[in-house]
A protein has these predicted regions:
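Final/C-terminal transmembrane alpha-helix of multipass membrane proteins
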Residues: 29, 171-189
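Juxtamembrane transmembrane-helix termini in multi-pass membrane transport proteins
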Residues: 10-60, 64
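Interfacial helix-loop-helix junctions of multi-pass membrane proteins
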Residues: 6, 57-74, 118-138, 147, ...
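Membrane helix-loop-helix hairpins that form the core translocation module of multi-pass transporters
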Residues: 41-94
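Membrane-interfacial alpha-helical segments at the cytosolic side of multi-pass membrane proteins
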Residues: 24-40, 63, 85-87, 123-124, ...
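Membrane interface segments of multi-pass transport proteins and intramembrane proteases
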Residues: 64-68, 91-96, 155-173
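Histidine-/acidic- and/or cysteine-rich, low-complexity loops and terminal segments associated
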Residues: 1-24, 93-97, 186-192
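Divalent metal-coordination and catalytic microenvironments
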Residues: 23, 53, 81, 112, ...
């Protein structure tokens, strides 16, 4: 259980680490438009993202896919930027948009998984039996994501319910900030 606990902790700490705020920004942008009463939709979004990053994390760790880390480091903020833009133009009542959002969470998870893989590969080294470590790391990532979602729900509740800020204004303001930060990140990481 020692290995499992270690990699679970590392996955959790990796996604909740402020130094790696790009993943935090993505989860924030992904669930920001949803009130806590729509927790099922958020759970589906986070699960789709987890499935995506789990697939590419495993494929990359097992050297089945190799993509330049400079491209991945560029594409990660692009996924954040697109998600923040979608928040600005989004209509919560349109189920077609929700299906698109689920699909984009899965697709963007594929990109983020390759970013996670660089970190995980550096810890694993040449160990041949890495299934347990891979599972533990993914579970840790998922737990960290759920903590971020809870924080978003709580902070949004404070601003929208207690401070009476209109939800659409809150979403627009925070998404605008996320857009600006991710644009700067993308420009700083241009791979060409």
């Amino acid at each position: 259980m020692g290995d499992f606990g270690f990699y679970l902790r590392e996955g959790f700490l990796h996604i909740t680490d402020w130094k790696g705020y790009d993943h935090i920004l993505f989860v924030l942008a992904l669930c920001l438009p949803y009130p806590a009463k729509n927790w099922r939709q958020v759970l589906i979004l986070i699960t789709a993202f987890t499935i995506g990053h789990s697939i590419t994390l495993a494929l990359s760790v097992f050297n089945r896919i190799l993509i330049s880390s400079s491209w991945i480091e560029f594409l990660i903020p692009v996924t954040i930027l697109i998600t923040a833009l979608e928040n600005v133009r989004r209509n919560n009542t349109d189920q077609t948009q929700n299906r698109w959002r689920y699909g984009s969470a899965l697709l963007f998870g594929l990109i983020h998984g390759m970013g996670f893989s660089n970190y995980l590969k550096s810890m694993l080294g040449k160990d041949e039996s890495i299934i347990t470590q891979l599972l533990a790391f993914n579970v840790g990532l998922e737990l960290g994501q759920l903590l971020i979602v809870l924080a978003v729900f709580l902070i949004t509740f404070v601003f929208v319910q207690l401070l009476n800020i209109k939800r659409s204004n809150w979403t627009l303001f925070v998404s605008g900030g996320i857009f600006g930060i991710s644009l700067i990140m993308a420009l700083e990481r241009l791979p060409f």
